Design a protein with these regions (language model features):
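GH16 jelly-roll
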Residues: 1-172
Length: 172
């Protein structure tokens, strides 16, 4: 039944945790401030699917969702950088638009159009983060660049394939 919402995903970590959890202690070892972040990936296609590779703020009190599932916003100090968010329904025929976002500022949201279907083959998606600048790349070509304040602290990497209805489309 396509009208039933279904949330499932494959991801590297559950980013909704408290500072005392074992998972938080492990992620602390992999968090960093600034650098080059890269993945070679073949994205999936299909409505209701979201390919995602992103950085999340290291501080568990500043995450987009609380451990109880309540959503916070930019005013609450939430920091997230989307290296790539590609909806499975946005293949070459539907525009192949990639979301590239810096979630702590109103001026850091980009919708970039690529002239290829990301589900047809592997591509290298990357982001360079330095003080005052964040730039996004695909196969070595710069897609977008944000100039302005950058996140003040360490962040950790998350990678996921989500199945969900709503803003990413009804599930096929």
């Amino acid at each position: 039944d396509k009208s039933t919402r279904c949330v499932s995903c494959i991801q590297t970590s559950d980013h909704r945790f408290g500072a005392t959890t074992a998972e938080y202690q492990i992620l602390d070892k992999f968090a960093q401030k600034y650098g080059w972040f890269e993945i070679r990936a073949k994205c999936t296609r299909g409505s209701g699917l979201l390919n995602a590779f992103w950085l999340h703020q290291h501080d568990p009190t500043k995450q987009e969702y609380t451990p109880e599932g309540e959503r916070k916003n930019v005013g609450d100090g939430v920091v997230e950088i989307d290296i790539i968010e590609l909806q499975g329904r946005h293949n070459a025929a539907a525009g192949n638009d990639v979301n590239l976002n810096v979630h702590f500022t109103e001026k850091g949201h980009f919708l970039h159009h690529n002239d290829f279907d990301a589900a047809d083959g592997f591509h290298v998606w990357a982001m360079e983060w330095e003080e005052g600048r964040i730039a996004w790349f695909c196969d070595g070509d710069r897609m977008e660049e944000y100039i302005g304040p950058t996140p003040p602290g360490k962040m950790f990497i998350l990678l996921a394939l989500f199945q969900y209805s709503g803003w990413i489309g009804d599930i096929d």
